[in-house]
Structure formats: structure tokens, C-alpha cells
């Protein structure tokens, strides 16, 4: 039996964020394959960050390369509170909360991600057969 699209999409979000934690920590990122995130993003991928800035796929991939091992040893990221908002065919819109812990500070973002099933991308086989098409993040107040 194959996994439902919602389950696969949630798994992709969790696994990619776990990868980012390892990628951004000192002494971890150099051992990891950047293809994990490069193959995860659709060629037309766009991120609307919590500050309202818009970045395309090339900008995000470049930024992630620049940040490799750039966070402290205590950097952590968690994703939670998943909700499938919409699904049609091979596409799904997910909401989730991303929490980051860095240098004693906690920040949270409400994220809405459009993902779709796609085995192949221009840069190779996508992890889990799911690719990111669009991501919108909004700051949440932390207490």
C-alpha cells in the first residue's frame, strides 16, 4: 500500500527540516549532500518569508549553501501542528508551525506550503517523490 499524499508531504516537511538542522550546525553540514534540498524545490519555487521578502529557487539554494554550518551547536528546529488545507490530484497545501531555537531565543512561524508529487526534477530524483512549489511564512508571537 502506498502512503497517502498528505502523509508523504508531512514526512517530506519533517525530513527536510531535520536535514536543515544538521546542515546548519557546525561539524555536520560538510558531511551532507546538498542535493537533498536542491532536488526538493520545484524550478519555479518561491518563498515569501516572514518579513514579506520573496526569494526564488536560485536565491534559496544559494542562501542555504552560504549558511552551511553557520548556526551554533545548540540550533534546533521543530515542525508541528500539521493540517492539510487543500488537496487536488497530485498537489497539496499544508499548514504547519516551525519553531527555531537559536542562541537562547525561540522564534515561530506559521507556514503554508504547496507541495506536489513529482519523481523527477531538472536536478534529479526528488526525495520521497514530493517537491516544494511555494512556501509562505508568517511570524508568530512567542511567549
Residues of each region from the PLM?
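Generic structural marker for isolated residues within well-ordered, non-membrane alpha-helices
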Residues: 34
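A beta-strand edge to alpha-helix "cap/lid" segment located at domain peripheries
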Residues: 1-25, 29-31, 46-143
Amino acid at each position: 500500500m502506498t502512503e497517502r499524499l498528505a502523509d508523504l508531504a508531512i514526512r517530506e516537511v519533517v525530513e527536510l527540516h531535520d536535514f536543515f538542522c544538521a546542515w546548519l550546525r557546525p561539524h555536520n553540514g560538510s558531511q551532507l549532500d546538498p542535493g537533498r534540498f536542491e532536488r526538493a524545490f520545484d524550478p519555479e519555487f518561491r518563498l515569501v518569508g516572514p518579513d514579506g521578502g520573496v526569494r526564488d529557487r536560485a536565491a534559496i539554494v544559494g542562501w542555504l549553501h552560504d549558511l552551511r554550518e553557520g548556526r551554533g551547536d545548540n540550533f534546533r528546529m521543530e515542525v508541528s501542528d500539521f493540517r492539510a488545507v487543500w488537496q487536488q490530484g497530485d498537489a497539496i497545501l499544508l499548514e504547519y508551525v516551525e519553531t527555531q531555537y537559536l542562541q537562547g531565543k525561540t522564534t515561530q512561524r506559521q507556514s503554508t506550503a504547496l507541495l506536489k508529487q513529482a519523481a523527477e526534477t531538472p536536478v534529479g530524483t526528488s526525495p520521497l517523490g514530493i517537491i516544494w512549489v511555494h512556501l509562505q511564512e508568517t511570524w508568530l508571537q512567542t511567549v
